[in-house]
Each structure stands twice: as structure tokens, then as C-alpha cells.
Amino acid sequence: MSASQGSKNTNAEPWGGFDDNIIQGTGSAVIDMENMDDTSGSSFEDVGEMHQRMREEEEVTAEAAATEEDNGEYGEFLGMKGLKGQLGRQVADEVWQAGKRQASKAFNLYANIDILRPYFDVEPIQVRNRLVESLIPVRMINFPQKVAGELYGPMMLVFTLVAILLHGMKTSGTVIREGTLMGTAIGTGFGYWLGVSSFIYFLAYLCNAQITMLQMLSLLGYGLFGHCVVLFITYNVHFHSLFYLLWMVIGGLSTLRMVAVLISRTVGQTPRLILCGSLAALHMLFLLYLHFAYHKMVEGILDTLEGPNIPPIQRVARDVPVVASAVVNATVKSIAAIVQSQQL
């Protein structure tokens, strides 16, 4: 039994070692099979693509390095010429990009012109009615009065005011180049419209008035209708009394219209007084300025053309006695000389 067991043990030891090798081998084989099972055919394709991509990146890197070496050698060979060439290409690229951006901005601006269309989409009969209403003060101030949110009528009135100012400059004899006359008239008209509208809107914001900037531009623009009427008449008919009458009636009506609208949209006595008083003072004083800015020159031209206020008869009457006495003295002297010659 012992011999048989010994033989069995001697036989078992090499087989045990062989079994260990088999187990180790099978262990490694199992691990490899699991990895092979986990990786599908697409994984092998991805690995191939990865190797291809790495190869392409290496080629691109090699080409870039070669290009840099060539550029370095070319730049060293050309010196300042190569540097100037590179700067020229960079400047040309920047100019091209800047022009491209400007062209795209111009195209976008032209495409966005339709944004302003609602502010100028108005019928002529509506403009006529609003011009008439600008001289009729509203009576109901308990609720906010409606203000048209359009800019066609106000802008046309500003251009009309510019034309009237040019007419006044020409009749007053202002000797300035035409471009300066036009620029002064446009600056005066649009400066008052935009500047006073912004200032009154700022005061309205401080006084908590319910009015927008667009409504303020429309309200003040239509308020210039009275100014246009008064200036057109008084620039052609030079009478102080007529101007003051039109200033009080027409200018006052247009101012009262705007004041009534602002009162209906403002709460509180003090805010109403500040807001409406500022607007009324600026609007009425602006009309006085536009009239008297060239009034002195007009009077000087009229005095030059018509002469001084002294009647010509009085001037002749003062000169007549002097002339008569001189003639009489000359006649007496001539007669005395003739008499003396006859006596001799």
C-alpha cells in the first residue's frame, strides 16, 4: 500500500505541477478571451482609425515643422524683405476683415430699416387733423390724454421750420456761405426738437409723468406748427404789434395744448408746475429768439433802403437859406464890380 501510495505521490507531483501550469495558462487564456469577448469588430476598426489618425497627425506635424524651417531659412535669407512681406500680408488680411465687417454692418442696417416703418406709417388726413388739434387745448385733464406715437408729422414740421429759417436769413441779408446757412438752420431746428424733448422727458421721469420719449418727440414736434405759422408771417410782414399778437395767440395755443397734455399725465401740483412751467418757458422763448435773431439786421436794411426817418423836405429847407444867401452875395458883388468899371 505504501509502495503504491508512494508511486501515486511520485506520479502526482509532476502532474500537480503540470496542473498548476495548466491552471495558470488557462487563467491567462480566460482573461484574454474575456477581453476578446468584450471587444467587438467595431472596436478593432476604432483602433485602426486611431492608428490612422495618429499617423496623419504625425505627418501634419512633420509638414508644419518643415514649413517653419523653410520659413526660417527664407526669412533669414531675405532678412527685412521677408519681414515686410509678412507684415504686408497681415495688414492686407486685417483690411479685408475690416471691410467685410463694415459691409456686413451696412447690410444689416439696410435690412433693419423696416424697424422704423411703424413710426412713419401715417395717412395725410391724420397728419392734417393732428396739425389742427395742436392749436386746440384739451379741457379734460382728469385722465391721460392720448398722444400720437409717430414721427412723420413732427419731422416734416422741423424741416418746414428749417426752410422758414433759411428764408429769414436770406431776407435779413446774412452774408454767409450757403452750407453754413443750411447747417445753422438744421442745427437750430433739430437741436431744439431733440434737446428740449430729451430735457422735458428727463423732468417727466423725475416727476413720475406717464409719457414716453416717442410721445414727447411727437408732442413737441406738433407744437412747432404754431412757430412755423408765426415766423412765416412775421418774416414777410415786419410789424412788431402783429408779431406780439400772433406770439400770444398762436404760440400760446400750441403751448397750452402741450401743457394740458402733460398736466393730464402728471400727478401732484408741484411736479405739474415744474414740468409745465419749464416747457412753456422754453417753447415761448424759443419763438422770441427765432424772431429777434435777425430783426435788427432787417431794420438796418430797411433804414438803408428807405433812408432815415427825417423827412427830406426839412433837410432841403435847412439847406435853402445858405444857398440863397450865397447867390445874393455873388450877385451883389458882380453888380458892384460892373458899376465901378462904368464909373472909371
Curated annotation (Swiss-Prot):
Gene Ontology, cellular component aspect: Golgi apparatus; plasma membrane
Keyword Glycoprotein belongs to the record: yes
Membrane-spanning intervals of the chain: 147-167, 186-206, 213-233, 243-263, 273-293
Glycoprotein found in the keyword field: yes
Chain ranges on the Cytoplasmic side, renumbered to this chain: 1-146, 207-212, 264-272
Gene Ontology BP term (one): cell differentiation
Bilayer topology annotation: Multi-pass membrane protein
InterPro entries noted in UniProt: tRNA_Mod/Golgi_Maint (IPR051521)
Positions in the Lumenal compartment: 168-185, 234-242, 294-344
Glycosylation positions in this chain: 329
Keywords tagged on the record: Cell membrane, Cytoplasm, Differentiation, Glycoprotein, Golgi apparatus, Membrane, Transmembrane, Transmembrane helix
Biased composition (Polar residues): 1-12
Localization terms from the record: Cell membrane; Golgi apparatus, cis-Golgi network membrane; Cytoplasm
Region: Disordered, residue numbers: 1-24
Family, as annotated: Belongs to the YIP1 family.
Function recorded in the entry: Involved in the maintenance of the Golgi structure. May play a role in hematopoiesis.
Protein known as: Protein YIPF3
Organism: Danio rerio
